[in-house]
């Protein structure tokens, strides 16, 4: 590897006057940018030749890690394989060249895909209607809460401003509620890791707008008392919100709508194999039960006879608006391709296989890693670090050492219920051979913690970047080249 190209920022490879491009001949005449719109000084951009740029970014990409590189057991993230067919379909010019303002008659096929995706999600979740407008999972979560707020406002029930979330909830739950102008109230978990119904009962009154739940929850445990919980919430006039972050193990097993949830969002990048990360694009469809459809944002697509039309109003004073046009259409298209590829028969296998894989790893390692809640899990589970605490090897050390063996680390120190949390989620894609290899490596690290703890505590040793100073990075974040150059 050329360390000069890898170890420096692209700005540090810049040489004045060096060019990697050429401009075409000007065939449109000379048109100056108005003086008031011109820069006062040159843009601070790197000047590099094409080969340097290609080598630099190729080296960077080779030192990244993704699902296509290897096993990625990042708990609560559902890092499943994104089939290439998804990308091929999304790249078809019939879809890629669409414009959101073109006439309905010229994009009937695209509108049909949008409509069919709405119906597919309804069938999978048991909810009446979906909007595909939200641009990310957290955006969908916010949209769902806005729907709930609009519902209560339409009834003149303005004092319902509280949202109850479990202490094991995803961080986006309280964050979305706060952004929506709602007050967050925390409900405790039992020693078994599920919602404490007695504690919840004491929190319910006529100020509660909704209860947000993830099922299975963040510990990978199924909330068995949902029937009782939803009855209590509905009796007090609140709504049930389903955080679709952990929908994957539910596929083929049960549906949120059938359990009594009123509103939910789905993370397409988790359950339906669209790309993770990179800052977007994302998609967070929101579904509602019958009776709440009028509060969903527009535009939406409806079918009239054999034609599809765009509906831009729902005729409500309390409508929700979250973005222009149809959300991230290409992301939705990838997810719909995944659904069609699996079909009804195989999509029913997703949940059971994800659950089987998680329990297989858990049972194989519980003698060397502490299992705080020893019960059957769903798609993921949480260890509380090594069973033998005398070595001084932490969850962070184990995670760093895993990098040396070519695995991405699991989610660590979340949920906050355990001091040395290590959350592992294998997804349904992984073979038994992959799981066995991963188990063997974690057992080897547990043995290293006893025989050579310093090797583990100073890991990683085989990666291009060694152990970084997390505390310094948090205290003195340098996020741009300008900060570094100053």
Regions found by a protein language model. Name each.
Residues 109, 139-306, 392-393, 420:
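Conserved PLP-enzyme active-site core in the AAT-like
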Residues 131, 185-187, 410:
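General small-molecule cofactor/ligand-binding pocket signal
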């Amino acid at each position: 590897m050329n360390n000069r190209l890898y170890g420096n920022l692209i700005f540090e490879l810049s040489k004045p006057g060096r060019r990697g491009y050429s401009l075409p001949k000007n065939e449109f005449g000379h048109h100056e940018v108005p003086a008031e719109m011109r820069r006062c000084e040159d843009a601070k951009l790197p000047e590099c030749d094409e080969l340097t740029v290609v080598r630099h970014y190729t080296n960077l990409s080779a030192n990244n890690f993704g699902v296509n590189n290897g096993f990625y057991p990042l708990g609560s993230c559902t890092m499943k394989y994104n089939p290439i067919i998804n990308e091929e379909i999304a790249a078809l010019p019939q879809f890629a060249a669409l414009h959101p303002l073109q006439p309905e008659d010229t994009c009937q096929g695209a509108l049909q895909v949008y409509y069919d995706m709405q119906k597919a999600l309804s069938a999978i979740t048991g909810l009446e209607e979906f909007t595909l407008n939200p641009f990310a999972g957290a955006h969908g979560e916010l949209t769902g809460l806005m729907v709930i707020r609009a519902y209560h406002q339409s009834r003149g029930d303005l004092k319902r401003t509280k949202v109850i979330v479990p202490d094991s909830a995803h961080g986006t739950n309280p964050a979305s509620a706060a952004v929506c102008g709602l007050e967050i109230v925390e409900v405790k978990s039992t020693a078994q890791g599920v919602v404490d119904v007695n504690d919840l009962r004491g929190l319910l009154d006529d100020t509660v707008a909704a209860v947000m739940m993830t099922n299975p929850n963040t510990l990978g445990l199924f909330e068995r008392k949902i029937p009782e919980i939803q009855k209590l919430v509905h009796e007090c006039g609140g709504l049930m919100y389903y955080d679709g972050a952990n929908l994957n193990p539910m596929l083929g097993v049960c549906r949120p709508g059938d359990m009594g949830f009123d509103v939910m969002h789905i993370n397409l990048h988790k359950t339906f194999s669209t790309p993770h990360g990179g800052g977007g694009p994302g998609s967070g469809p929101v579904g509602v039960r019958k009776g709440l459809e009028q509060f969903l944002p527009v535009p939406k697509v409806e079918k009239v006879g054999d034609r599809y039309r765009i509906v831009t109003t729902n005729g409500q004073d309390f409508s929700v608006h979250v973005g222009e046009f149809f959300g991230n259409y290409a992301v939705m298209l990838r997810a719909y391709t995944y659904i069609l590829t699996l079909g009804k028969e195989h999509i029913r296998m997703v949940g059971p296989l994800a659950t089987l894989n998680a329990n297989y790893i858990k049972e194989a390692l519980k003698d060397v890693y502490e299992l705080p809640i020893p019960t059957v899990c769903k798609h993921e589970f949480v260890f509380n670090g090594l069973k033998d605490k005398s070595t001084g090897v932490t969850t962070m050390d184990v995670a760093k050492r895993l990098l040396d063996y070519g695995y991405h680390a699991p989610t660590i120190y979340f949920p906050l219920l355990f001091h040395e949390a290590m959350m592992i989620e294998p997804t349904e894609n992984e073979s038994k051979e992959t799981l066995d290899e991963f188990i063997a490596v974690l057992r080897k690290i547990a043995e290293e913690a006893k025989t050579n703890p310093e090797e583990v505590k100073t890991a990683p040793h085989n990666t291009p970047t060694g152990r970084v100073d997390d505390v310094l990075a948090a205290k003195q974040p340098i996020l741009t080249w300008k900060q570094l150059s100053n």
